[in-house]
Amino acid sequence: MPFISVTRLRLRSARYLIPFMIYALMSSRQARRSRGNLGVKLLRDSNRAFWTLTAWQKDEDMRSFMMAGSHRRAMPRLLDWCDEASVAHWSQETAELPGWDQAHRKLVEQGRSSKVRFPSSDQIARRIPEPHT
């Protein structure tokens, strides 16, 4: 059964946009080339928010990707760059990536907040705005 991962990150300042985009593009390319990857979608939302949606053959494939290469190097930086960060994972019948509305619903219902050093009021209250597609 395919394993789906959705992440939403919001940069706390535009000053982090260029380095974030470099890591995001490198991580996206890394994901597409990783063992077990079935699909990758990215969304640049409003208010410096960014979404990723990936499908994997199994959760171990996603975890191997997450702990290697560009993605691994980016993760520690996000503690300072982001003021909102959330992630959700689930299994589904098909390998087709869900729409952003379903990804948002899963993030709200099943997601968890990731640690950031300077959380916004939305991060503290666990409010996750709907994506603007």
Report each predicted region and the residues it spans.
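An amphipathic, aromatic/His-enriched active-site/gating alpha helix that lines ligand/cofactor pockets
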Residues: 59-87
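Short S/T/G/P-rich N-terminal loop/turn motif that feeds into the first structured element of a domain
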Residues: 1-49, 61-64, 85-133
